[in-house]
């Protein structure tokens, strides 16, 4: 029985090219590339850019669509997180994974965002 439990635990640990990653729970997402964890950590999704909700470059309709898509994927969900760095606003720049699904890549593949060329070297999939 102990071996079976260990096997199940091993299978359910998220793995990626980076090995086992820490788990966090997303409280909500402000927009298509910024989320907050239940611990209050602000996460800026690495390697992508999505439309802005506010400001000079605001494009509210696609921005809300990207935000809603992201919220449906990750809000109140356990996700794996690969922390990369901190940005100039103090947010953690990171990749999020739901199982084997790279959330950033999915947003780009579904048309909700684009690869952020300036930082694309931070993620294996966007190089």
Whereabouts are the PLM-identified features?
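Small beta-barrel nucleic-acid-binding modules, primarily SNase/OB-fold domains
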Residues: 3-127
């Amino acid at each position: 029985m102990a071996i079976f439990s260990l096997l199940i635990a091993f299978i359910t640990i998220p793995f990626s090219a980076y090995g086992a990653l820490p788990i966090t729970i997303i409280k909500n997402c402000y927009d298509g590339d910024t989320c907050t964890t239940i611990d209050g950590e602000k996460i800026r999704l690495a390697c992508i850019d999505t439309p802005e909700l506010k400001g000079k470059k605001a494009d509210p309709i696609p921005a809300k669509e990207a935000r809603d898509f992201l919220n449906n994927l990750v809000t109140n969900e356990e996700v794996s997180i690969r922390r990369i760095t901190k940005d100039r606003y103090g947010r953690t720049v990171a990749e999020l994974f739901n199982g084997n699904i790279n959330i950033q890549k999915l947003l780009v593949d579904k048309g909700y965002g684009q690869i952020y060329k300036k930082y694309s070297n931070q993620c294996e999939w966007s190089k």
